[in-house]
Amino acid sequence: ILGLRDEKIICSSVPPYCIPLGNKVYEWLVNEFQNSDLHVIYAFSKDYYSSVASLNEMGATWALKHKWTGVLLPGFQFNQLDGCIDKTQIAIKLDDSDNRTLKYRLSEFKDELIKEFNLRPMSEATWERQRDDFLDRISTITEARARECKDTGEADQRHVPTIGQDDVGSIPVEPAFLL
């Protein structure tokens, strides 16, 4: 991701970013939270807020004052943010109706990560292609999930889960991951 080395990314249930074999999950996470300068990326959704593990990570991030960035998955609204996070902190909404704002926020985030982790910048053409491919994948997944909800008659069609452990593939996102 943007040239960040795999060993610098933790996504607890997604290989190769997962917790190393033989480790105790919570002991390992506590060690990472206490001994690393983390940047936590939240993928906010209804599913995120139903995950005890995700809420524990949110609390640890808040208590230890680690840097974080919020990403609202499609179908999740700003007024649904809850918990100990600062709800006034600007976040990225992946189904923002203002496409210019969405692209701008993603570019801001890319630039922030490049600066924070001293990564090699990429050309604008490469970035725009990767960003637009990412947004196209988000849109495709969202549309497929909306059709599934319609076909199955799922009651809450406003919440369309889009990305998570079941949809990792080339979009490495789970409820929260740490850099």
Question: Positions of the model-derived regions?
Answer:
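Conserved beta-strand scaffold positions in the cores of enzyme catalytic domains, especially
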Residues: I9, W68-G70, Q89-K93
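Alpha-helical scaffold elements adjacent to nucleotide-binding pockets in ATP/GTP-utilizing enzyme cores
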Residues: I1, N56-T61, R105-E112
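Conserved BB-loop
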Residues: L2-N31, D47-S54, I114, L119
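A general structural motif
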Residues: D6, S36-D37, E148-C149
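C-terminal interaction surface of TIR/SEFIR-family domains
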Residues: G75-L179
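Residues at the C-termini of beta-strands that transition into short coil/loop
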Residues: S13-P15, L72, D95
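Conserved beta-strand-loop-alpha-helix hinge of the TIR/SEFIR fold
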Residues: W28-Q80
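Short, structured coil segments at secondary-structure junctions
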Residues: R5, E57, L64, I85-T88
